[in-house]
């Protein structure tokens, strides 16, 4: 199973508009971060996790092939703002979208023309599905993982020995048990140490990682305050890394 990190940035992306810090002015391409998203491929099957406002740019860099399903972690714009750009992929067939009830309602409210009885030509053909327990989508067996983004319940996902969690500030013990011992974990870390009300930091993520004990960890959903990619890589434990846009790995 191949995983591609399409975007590794937080809601503002990196560089942040108007900022002249060393990260935002870095010439290292790993310090350039589009909004967070991941593409999972196994054989001919392709699964997208989140579809933010940078989706079009992200997919112009990839081979144009069918997307079998989309998993949404939650309703915020940086994770759903690119759904309309699924239009070209709908030429290859309708695209099922899986999300929790709150996100399903949000998508219907912001893209009403996709779900009206009378549709004009060219709109994306999206099929919304409310997640209720484990399910299959796009040829993958998927286990939803409930986490909290501040007070907002959102979803992470386990797919085989891989788990993807973003925007998390807290996870309940029974949900943590579902991903203990996995091979590869992608998890959010907004910045290195300064606490935030609805996103965990690298230091806070260490506690979760020590419970899960994955073989390898990639941090995602990072802001410019994370620090320079090259510098932070040197101080992380050997099995932990900052993800970067375009990173590919296999599970």
Language model: regions and residue ranges:
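Short glycine-/acidic-enriched loop or helix-start segments at secondary-structure transitions
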Residues: 15, 58-60, 81-83, 108-109, ...
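Active-site neighborhood of phospho(di)ester-bond hydrolases with catalytic His/Asp-centered motifs
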Residues: 48-52, 68-76, 98-100, 163-168, ...
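Core dinuclear metal-dependent hydrolase active-site scaffold
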Residues: 1-49, 53-62, 125-177, 245-251
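Active-site metal-binding motif and surrounding structural segment of the metallo-beta-lactamase
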Residues: 44-99, 182-184
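Binuclear metal-ion centers of metallo-dependent hydrolases, dominated by the metallo-beta-lactamase
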Residues: 172-251
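Active-site neighborhood of divalent metal-dependent phosphoester bond hydrolases
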Residues: 91-93, 103-128
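Short, glycine/charged-enriched secondary-structure capping and boundary segments
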Residues: 18-20, 62-64, 84-88, 111-113, ...
């Amino acid at each position: 199973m191949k995983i591609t990190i399409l975007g590794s940035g937080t809601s503002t992306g990196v560089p942040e508009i108007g900022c002249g810090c060393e990260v935002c002015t870095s010439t290292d391409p790993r310090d350039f971060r589009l909004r967070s998203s991941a593409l999972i491929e196994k054989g001919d099957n392709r699964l997208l996790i989140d579809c933010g406002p940078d989706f079009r740019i992200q997919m112009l860099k990839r081979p144009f092939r069918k997307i079998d399903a989309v998993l949404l972690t939650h309703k915020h714009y940086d994770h759903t703002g690119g759904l309309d750009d699924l239009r070209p992929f709908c030429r290859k067939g309708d695209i099922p979208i899986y999300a929790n009830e709150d996100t399903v309602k949000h998508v219907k409210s912001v893209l009403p023309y996709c779900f009206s009885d009378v549709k004009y030509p060219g709109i994306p053909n999206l099929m919304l599905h409310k997640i209720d327990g484990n399910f299959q989508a796009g040829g993958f067996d998927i286990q939803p993982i409930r986490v909290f983004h501040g007070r907002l319940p959102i979803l992470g996902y386990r797919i085989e020995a891989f788990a993807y969690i973003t925007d998390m500030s807290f996870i309940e013990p029974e949900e943590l048990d579902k991903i203990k011992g996995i091979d590869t974990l992608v998890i959010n870390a907004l910045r290195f140490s300064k606490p935030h009300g609805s996103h965990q930091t690298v230091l806070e993520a260490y506690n979760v990682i020590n419970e899960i004990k994955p073989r390898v960890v990639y941090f995602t959903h990072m802001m410019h305050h994370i620090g320079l990619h090259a510098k932070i890589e040197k101080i992380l434990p050997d099995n932990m890394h900052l993800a970067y846009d375009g990173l590919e790995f296999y599970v």
